[in-house]
Amino acid sequence: MFIVFLLVVLATTVGSFTLDRVLEGRNAAAIDNALDQRDPKRQTPGCCWNPACVKNRCGRR
């Protein structure tokens, strides 16, 4: 019974660390995207960040 308990604890720990790494990657990408939108120096000149007009600017169609 103790071995089953240890296996459950191990599986939970491994799952937790894996999930943390996945979420850190997503958070980093989201933060980088937010910085691009807020900082005028990082934006493409003449590019509109409004989703309604992006298709008409920046060569995105």
UniProtKB/Swiss-Prot annotation:
Q: Please give the residue positions where the record annotates the modification Hydroxyproline.
A: 45
Q: Name one Pfam family in it.
A: Toxin_8
InterPro entries in UniProt = Conotoxin_a-typ
The Pyrrolidone carboxylic acid modification is found at 43
Q: Write out the GO cellular component annotations.
A: extracellular region; host cell postsynaptic membrane
Q: Where located?
A: Secreted
**What is recorded about the protein's domains?**
The cysteine framework is I (CC-C-C). Alpha4/4 pattern.
Additional record remark: Negative results: has no effect on chimeric alpha-7 (CHRNA7), alpha-3-beta-2 (CHRNA3-CHRNB2) and alpha-4-beta-2 (CHRNA4-CHRNB2).
Q: Which family does it belong to?
A: Belongs to the conotoxin A superfamily.
Q: What does this protein do?
A: Alpha-conotoxins bind to the nicotinic acetylcholine receptors (nAChR) and inhibit them. This peptide potently blocks muscular nicotinic acetylcholine receptor (CHRNA1-CHRNB1-CHRNG-CHRND), and has no effect on neuronal receptors. It is able to totally displace [125I]-Bgtx from the Torpedo receptor with a complete inhibition in the high micromolar range. It produces a biphasic inhibition curve which fits nicely with a two-site model (Ki of 0.46 and 105 nM).
Name under which the protein is recorded: Alpha-conotoxin EIIA
